[in-house]
């Protein structure tokens, strides 16, 4: 009899079979589920603390997604030969899993929960992120931890006008869409996508399609829970002290309402701090015992109620706008004198200084992903220091939020970048957030597009982004355009849309409540389009099209094509020729397998010199053409003349002069530069040369060779030097 109480559930999902197992591996975790989708295997474990820490005022959920290199049959390439810090993909996948599950833990549940996902086998054609989301949903559901799930998840592609479920790497190459959607049976909770300028209708259809497909996984998880679920924790939210709540509300409400009439963020924040301090002082003065953490939580609830009720009642928003108005926009291009491209994009109290840098192919980011190595020639980095929100904070390594915002901005812009053939540069864009009050990632999209155009990148279209919010109470709702930071915190949805005048290039949605309908998403998309068109108009006014010339400080790229068989000649023995070329011309030279050569230089003259020398190295000797070159070797029967780099020809003794030549050394010396004409070449690449063909014939010379010369000196019937001597 086995020591394991193993339970397995399998289901067909599109063209793939999904197998879920629990009860055999990681049995000491609160919940553990192994998911196998066509040889991609992930293990999701969940552990929850039975008690919340004293004074805990937020839900401490941690999600760690970890890819093991052995999953793809690889050994880590680092010095220590073991997995190191999380890659960007691991960080993004951790966020992707965190976002849909976080809203499903009950309000007031502050016990620490740690979710760990290991990818332990990988089929490159089956993405591990979807398998991981299903595994986490199942692990939480069987664990007994309070969780209002399960969730389902699906990836959606769009190929030939049809939606495709969970397309693999190969299928995605021909897809116009890469969208991941997650949600419960009742509602969508999270969307992450990039698209090739698709319409709002197609995007919404993809969300609905993915949500429906995710329900297949939810049904299977319900079956797994019925057979293997642990008892649900006997957890109850802390009882509310209604008397104390009423006391705090009476002390705070008027002060908070007054604070939310202040339109400036800094002044409003200061007023809110003073209101909070006043409430605490009043409670102390009245001798009321209280927990400061709980009072702060109550004040937040009161603030949310005030702001939400005002908006639903049709009153002005926090900064005085109505629900559809975009904050004032200011744009300045070419902000920095020596960068390749720059733009300052300001929308209300959100500001991004975005800088673009152009580099060569060698500057491309080489990524050793689990599914295979690849090069990325478009890099986008987002930085948000503490001063952007007027706060004191630590500066350290890049945070998960910064990585996520940078990836969203990159996804928004990548659809409108020129192809490598059109613009062979590696591009790095850095968005420095200098002020933030809502939607800094979308400001990065707008500023990034303008910065790229300022750098001379021929974008296919202007790209703008906008963040939408939602306030929903029962059947009443209001969609907010261009949300502020406070509206993000106090609202029910963060809905970011980026795109061009033709369609959407990126869509990200995070919903904190259940019950968001298709109709609400439709309204949000329509309102976002209206705002996007407004911002695009402002951007087009500021910069109608990309600069036609790149910065004088950027490297100039020149391309040329050579016969692939000549690549080794350009590289030379041990790379000697290519090293000499780069050192002597000051250029970077990159050679591809198809014979395409890219020359990067700061000055056109240097590039021209490098190009000329490469042309010399790869040139073919032409019959009938006159060349000038040095004598490289004297032979008894002639001399070897260098015609082109690495290419010599034989000047036979009979072709040196019209008169009879007894000794080659009487006419030629090594190093002497002479003009010669190419008489012929053979299929082995041997070249026959003549000097006398270029010299005037002496008077009285009949032109007939002397008997000893007929047949070009009978001692050499092969007509010249051996093949080895010519080479």
UniProtKB/Swiss-Prot annotation:
Transferase in keyword set: yes
Location, primary (coarse class): cytoplasm
Alphabetical list of SMART domains matching this protein: KH, S1
Domain KH span(s) in chain numbering: 555-614
Reactions it catalyzes: RNA(n+1) + phosphate = RNA(n) + a ribonucleoside 5'-diphosphate
Cofactor(s) of this protein: Mg(2+)
PROSITE patterns given in the database record: KH_TYPE_1 (PS50084), S1 (PS50126)
Region (Disordered): 691-727
Residues that hold Mg(2+) according to the record: 488, 494
Record flagged with keyword Zinc: no
EC number: 2.7.7.8
Record's compositionally biased regions (Basic and acidic residues): 707-720
GO CC aspect terms: cytosol
GO molecular function, one term: magnesium ion binding
Domain annotation S1 motif: ranges: 624-692
Subcellular locations according to the entry: Cytoplasm
Biological role stated in the UniProt entry: Involved in mRNA degradation. Catalyzes the phosphorolysis of single-stranded polyribonucleotides processively in the 3'- to 5'-direction.
Name of the protein: Polyribonucleotide nucleotidyltransferase
Native source species: Acidovorax ebreus (strain TPSY) (Diaphorobacter sp. (strain TPSY))
């Amino acid at each position: 009899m086995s020591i394991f109480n193993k339970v397995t559930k399998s289901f067909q999902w599109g063209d793939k079979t999904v197998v879920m197992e629990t009860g055999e591996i990681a049995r000491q975790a609160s919940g553990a589920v192994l998911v196998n989708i066509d040889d991609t295997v992930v293990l999701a474990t969940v552990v929850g603390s039975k008690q919340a820490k004293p004074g805990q005022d937020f839900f401490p959920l941690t999600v760690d997604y970890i890819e093991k290199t052995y999953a793809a049959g690889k050994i880590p390439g680092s010095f220590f030969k073991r997995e190191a810090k999380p890659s960007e993909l691991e960080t993004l996948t951790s966020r992707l899993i965190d976002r849909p599950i976080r809203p499903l833990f009950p309000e007031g549940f502050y016990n620490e929960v740690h979710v760990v996902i290991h990818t332990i086998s990988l089929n490159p054609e089956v993405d591990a992120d979807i398998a991981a989301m299903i595994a986490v949903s199942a692990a939480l559901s069987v664990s007994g931890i309070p969780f209002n799930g399960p969730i389902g998840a699906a990836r959606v592609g769009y190929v030939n006008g049809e939606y495709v479920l969970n397309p693999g790497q190969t299928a995605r190459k021909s897809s116009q869409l890469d969208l991941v959607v997650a949600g419960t049976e009742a509602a969508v909770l999270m969307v992450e996508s990039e698209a090739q300028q698709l319409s709002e209708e197609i995007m919404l259809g993809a969300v609905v399609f993915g949500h429906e497909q995710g329900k297949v996984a939810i049904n299977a998880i319900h079956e797994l829970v019925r057979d293997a679920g642990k008892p649900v924790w006997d957890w109850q939210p802390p009882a509310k002290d209604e008397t104390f709540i009423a006391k705090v509300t009476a002390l705070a409400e008027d002060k908070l309402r007054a604070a939310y009439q202040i339109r400036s963020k800094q002044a409003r924040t200061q007023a809110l701090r003073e209101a909070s301090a006043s409430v605490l002082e009043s409670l102390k003065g009245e001798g009321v015992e209280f927990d400061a953490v709980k009072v702060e939580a109550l004040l937040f609830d009161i603030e949310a109620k005030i702001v939400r009720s005002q908006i639903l009642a049709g009153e002005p928003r926090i900064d005085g706008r109505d629900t559809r108005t975009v904050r004032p926009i200011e744009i300045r291009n070419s902000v920095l004198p020596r960068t390749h491209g720059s733009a300052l994009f300001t929308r209300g109290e959100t500001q991004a200084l975005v800088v673009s840098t152009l580099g060569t192919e060698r500057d491309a980011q080489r990524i050793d992903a689990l599914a295979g190595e690849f090069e990325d020639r478009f890099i986008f980095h987002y930085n948000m220091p503490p001063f952007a929100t007027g706060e004191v904070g630590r500066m350290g390594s890049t945070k998960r939020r910064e990585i996520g915002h940078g990836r969203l901005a990159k996804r928004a812009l990548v659809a409108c970048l020129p192809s490598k053939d059109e613009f062979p540069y590696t591009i790095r864009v850095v968005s420095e957030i200098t002020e933030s009050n809502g939607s800094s990632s979308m400001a990065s999209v707008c500023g990034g597009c303008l910065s790229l155009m300022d750098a001379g990148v021929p974008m296919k279209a202007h790209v703008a982004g906008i963040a939408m919010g939602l306030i929903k109470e029962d059947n009443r709702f209001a969609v907010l355009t261009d949300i502020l930071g406070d509206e993000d915190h106090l609202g029910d949805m963060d809905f970011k849309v980026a795109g061009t005048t033709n369609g959407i290039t990126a869509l990200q949605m995070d919903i904190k409540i259940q019950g968001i309908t298709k109709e609400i998403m439709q309204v949000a998309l329509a309102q976002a389009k209206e705002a996007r068109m407004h911002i695009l108009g402002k951007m087009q006014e500021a910069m109608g099209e990309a600069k036609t010339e790149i910065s004088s400080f950027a490297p100039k790229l020149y391309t040329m094509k050579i016969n692939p068989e000549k690549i080794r000649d350009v590289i030379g023995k041990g790379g000697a020729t290519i090293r000499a070329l780069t050192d002597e011309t000051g250029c970077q030279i990159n050679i591809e397998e198809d014979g395409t050569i890219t020359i990067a230089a700061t000055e056109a003259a240097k590039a021209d010199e490098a190009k000329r020398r490469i042309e010399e190295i790869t040139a073919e000797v032409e019959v009938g053409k006159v060349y000038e070159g040095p004598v490289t070797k004297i032979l008894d029967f002639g001399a070897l003349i260098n015609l082109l780099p690495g290419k010599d020809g034989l000047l036979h003794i009979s072709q040196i002069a019209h008169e009879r030549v007894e000794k080659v050394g009487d006419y030629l010396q090594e190093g002497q530069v002479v003009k010669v004409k190419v008489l012929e070449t053979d299929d082995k690449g041997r070249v026959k040369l003549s000097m006398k063909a270029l010299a005037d014939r002496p008077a009285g010379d009949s032109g007939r060779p002397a008997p000893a010369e007929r047949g070009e000196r009978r001692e050499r019937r092969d007509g010249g030097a051996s093949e080895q001597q010519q080479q």
